[in-house]
């Protein structure tokens, strides 16, 4: 059988692509080296932020607004356990923060619902938060967080119900191109398709070593917290920048545990074996202490944590482009630790590519040619 589309990597983007392409009537094969959702990539750990007024640059805003529409649609499949939780996101940092300036600019350009608070206003709204006098907060009332593993599980189930073929726990070992399309090699045999999507995450260079993607080991952890820090008490998700420039992110507490991680830093790795479990690097359990001590002093001890991997591009912007010399293969990689919120729209973009549809978005900033 020759498929219309083969998807290599069925984590966040691949799961979405499999669903949207199958829903569009294509004959699709989803593949993954493991059984998604799993612990080997970048999507585990229960939750991921979704922010609309984007501190990484306004080029992302049209994408994230479409992503939000698709997340809302997906959430309707799980109304008892919603995939998207509109908790709001408070972005904290010094008044001269470049990141916050980008957030404010994005909000102004796209007329997003963002409220600016000074230090006293932040602490009056959320007494659990402490910030210096020179800090400001930009509160995105319509943003929140996503249940990442539930989202992937839902997409995979919906795709399967729609007739999508799925080959999991079976790594793709090679990709070949010829006049007839794309062929992948696996331990289960060879499979052919007219087109392919490569969204293999951290270890995409095992297949395409020429790509400018660097895996980085990252950790996040859950800390003891009480009901004051919960969604029920209107405690928001958050990003926070310390005076030294370190960037943190976190979520409202669930079951008396608040999850937090540090966005920058981490350990450069070159193989999956180097991504050692949480606590095997001395700094893992204390990485969030500078933020917690200064901004959330009421949070208790570290309960447990996990390690994941970022697939960083050189400029930490996404790579969305066809494979050089092969216009029938789309790459979606280099998501650099801020990609999950876009998984829905990136999956839709992949499905449009498979149908020869022109994208509704300007993807020029994400081309590989910027690294030449």
Curated annotation (Swiss-Prot):
Its EC number is 1.5.3.-. The keyword Oxidoreductase applies. GO terms for molecular function: flavin adenine dinucleotide binding; N-methyl-L-amino-acid oxidase activity; sarcosine oxidase activity. InterPro entries: FAD-dep_OxRdtase, FAD/NAD-bd_sf, Me_Trp_Oxase_MTOX, MTOX. Its cofactor is FAD. The modification S-8alpha-FAD cysteine is found at residue 308. The keyword Cytoplasm does not apply. GO terms for cellular component: cytosol. FAD binds at residues 4-34. Gene3D superfamilies: D-Amino Acid Oxidase, subunit A, domain 2 (3.30.9.10), FAD/NAD(P)-binding domain (3.50.50.60). It catalyses: N(alpha)-methyl-L-tryptophan + O2 + H2O = L-tryptophan + formaldehyde + H2O2. Binds 1 FAD per subunit. Keywords: FAD, Flavoprotein, Oxidoreductase. It comes from the Bacteria. Catalyzes the oxidative demethylation of N-methyl-L-tryptophan. Monomer. Belongs to the MSOX/MTOX family. MTOX subfamily. This is N-methyl-L-tryptophan oxidase. The gene is solA.
């Amino acid at each position: 059988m020759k498929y219309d589309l083969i998807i290599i990597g069925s984590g966040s983007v691949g799961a979405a692509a499999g669903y949207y392409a199958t829903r569009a009537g294509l004959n699709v094969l989803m593949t993954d080296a493991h059984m998604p959702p799993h612990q080997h990539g970048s999507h585990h750990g229960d939750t991921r932020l979704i922010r609309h007024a984007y501190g990484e640059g306004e080029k992302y805003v049209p994408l994230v607004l479409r992503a939000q529409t698709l997340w809302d649609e997906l959430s309707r499949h799980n109304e008892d356990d919603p995939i998207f939780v509109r908790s709001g996101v408070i972005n904290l940092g010094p008044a001269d923060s470049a990141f916050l300036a980008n957030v404010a600019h994005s909000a102004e350009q796209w007329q997003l619902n963002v409220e600016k608070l000074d230090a006293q206003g932040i602490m009056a709204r959320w007494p659990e938060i402490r910030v210096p006098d020179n800090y400001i907060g930009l509160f995105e009332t319509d943003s929140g967080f996503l249940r990442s593993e539930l989202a992937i599980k839902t997409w995979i189930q919906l795709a399967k119900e729609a007739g999508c073929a799925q080959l999991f726990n079976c790594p793709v070992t090679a990709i070949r191109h010829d006049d007839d399309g794309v062929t992948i090699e696996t331990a289960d045999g060879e499979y052919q398709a007219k087109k392919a999507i490569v969204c293999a995450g951290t270890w995409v260079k095992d297949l395409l070593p020429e790509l400018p993607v660097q895996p980085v080991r990252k950790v996040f952890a859950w800390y003891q917290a009480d009901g004051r820090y919960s969604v029920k008490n209107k405690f928001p998700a958050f990003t926070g920048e310390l005076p030294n420039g370190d960037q943190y992110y976190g979520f409202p507490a669930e079951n008396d545990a608040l999850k937090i991680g540090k966005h920058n830093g981490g350990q450069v790795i070159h193989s999956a074996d180097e991504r050692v479990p949480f606590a095997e690097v001395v700094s893992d359990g204390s990485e969030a202490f500078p933020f917690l001590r200064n901004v959330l002093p009421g949070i208790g001890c570290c309960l447990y944590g996990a390690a994941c991997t970022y697939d960083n591009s050189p400029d930490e912007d996404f790579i969305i482009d066809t494979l050089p010399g092969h216009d029938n293969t789309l790459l979606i990689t280099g998501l650099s630790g801020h990609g999950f919120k876009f998984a829905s729209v990136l999956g839709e973009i992949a499905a449009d590519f498979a149908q020869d549809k022109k994208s509704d978005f300007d993807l020029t900033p994400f081309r590989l040619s910027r690294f030449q």
